[in-house]
C-alpha cells in the first residue's frame, strides 16, 4: 500500500449522523467521520469494541485508555481490529480496524471515528490524532 494515499482525505457530504465525513486510503474503503452520539463515553467505547467482537471494558479500563485532546476536552483513544460488523447489520468486513476518540464535550458525546482496512488505519493513526487536536465545537 502506498502510505501517501492514507494522508489524502476526500470530503464527502455530511449525513444525518455524520457532521463531517471523509474517505481515505488506497482501497477507497477507509472512512473517517465526526458525530455526536447518545449515551456515555463508556457506552460508545463498548459499542465500537462490539463492532469488532472485542470484549467490553469497564470504567477502570476506560480510565487506562490513552487520552487525546479533542474540541478543548480530553477524550479516550479507542482501537480495535478484526471483522468489522458495522452499524445496522451491514455486511461483515474482515481485516478491518477502528481508531478514534470519544469525549464528553459540553454535555454532548463527540466522536471522531476512523474505520477501514487495518493497514490503512494503522498508517493514518497519527494523522487522525493530529486532526482531533484541531477540532472545535461551534458556540
Which role fits each region the language model picked out?
Residues 1-9, 107-139:
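Surface-exposed amphipathic alpha-helical segments
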Residues 2-54:
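Secretory pathway targeting signatures of secreted, lumenal, and periplasmic proteins
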Residues 13, 36-38, 49-56, 106, ...:
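Sec/Tat-exported extracytoplasmic proteins
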Residues 19, 42-49, 99-100, 125-132:
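Extracytoplasmic/secreted envelope proteins and their assembly/folding machinery
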Residues 22-26, 80, 103-105:
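Active-site beta-strand termini and strand-to-loop segments that position acidic
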Residues 31-38, 88, 114-122:
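Second-shell loop/turn segments in exported
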Residues 33, 76-79, 110-113:
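Structural recognition of the beta-strand scaffold that forms the well-ordered cores
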Residues 46-103:
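Signature of long, low-cysteine stretches enriched in small and polar/charged residues
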Amino acid at each position: 500500500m502506498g502510505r501517501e494515499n492514507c494522508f489524502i482525505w476526500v470530503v464527502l457530504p455530511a449525513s444525518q449522523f455524520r457532521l463531517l465525513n471523509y474517505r481515505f486510503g488506497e482501497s477507497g474503503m477507509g472512512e473517517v467521520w465526526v458525530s455526536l452520539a447518545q449515551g456515555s463515553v463508556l457506552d460508545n467505547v463498548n459499542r465500537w469494541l462490539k463492532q469488532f467482537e472485542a470484549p467490553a471494558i469497564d470504567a477502570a479500563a476506560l480510565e487506562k485508555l490513552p487520552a487525546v485532546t479533542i474540541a478543548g476536552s480530553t477524550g479516550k483513544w479507542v482501537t480495535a481490529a478484526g471483522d468489522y460488523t458495522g452499524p445496522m447489520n451491514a455486511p461483515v468486513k474482515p481485516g478491518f480496524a477502528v481508531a478514534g476518540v470519544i469525549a464528553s464535550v459540553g454535555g454532548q458525546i463527540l466522536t471522531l471515528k476512523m474505520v477501514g482496512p487495518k493497514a490503512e488505519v494503522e498508517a493514518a493513526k497519527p494523522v487522525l490524532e493530529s486532526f482531533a487536536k484541531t477540532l472545535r465545537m461551534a458556540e
